[in-house]
Amino acid sequence: MTTLLIATRNAHKVAEIQAILGTGFACRPLLAEFPAAPIAVEDADTFAGNALKKAESLSHWLAASLQAGGSRDGHLTIGATRTFVLADDSGLEVDALGGAPGVHSARFAAMESGRDGNSPDADNNAKLLRLLATVPREKRTARFRCALALVEFFPSGDGQKEPHLFDGACEGWIDFAPRGKGGFGYDPLFIPTGRDQSFAELGEDVKNGISHRAKALAGLREWFGRSGGK
């Protein structure tokens, strides 16, 4: 069993990653289990840059904290299983908006008021619809992108291997109103190419077979199968 410490507090994201990877992996929310962990400033201009920054900084912090005896939670069994820190940075690119919200997807609405932190999904969706109010169907093309950064975790902090990056994209378009109750983020507005339902309507099984995150995780799973994670 390989343990993946997911660099997020987002329970939806952890559950989605676990569902896509299936057996052989135990996914855990690193930031929820270690509340004192620092949140990396996502100031890179690419999804891959942000994912890499989060994975490396959290891996180093966790090793230092465990050595100091400051963050043991009684559940992380070092040595019994190989453990990796996995960071995901993903978002929506809308062509009519020049690729926005892009790396700012989670804090899209908050940026208008200068607030720090992420915005509620409903606020982000409302802003997106407002900006696209006069844009016709044929120009509402968009895609979800996902970048994953994987770093093997060593409690000693020594011998950290080179990180591995994986990416995926899902093409589609932005609907004129939210549809469906499932998913999270921009899922109620995103209609993937070849479908007539939003991600929020398709259900987890269908979404997890075609999404940007599913494609990135397929690369990760294939890498583990080919290399044994080495």
Please annotate each region the language model reported.
Residues 2-5, 11-230:
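Anionic-ligand binding patches
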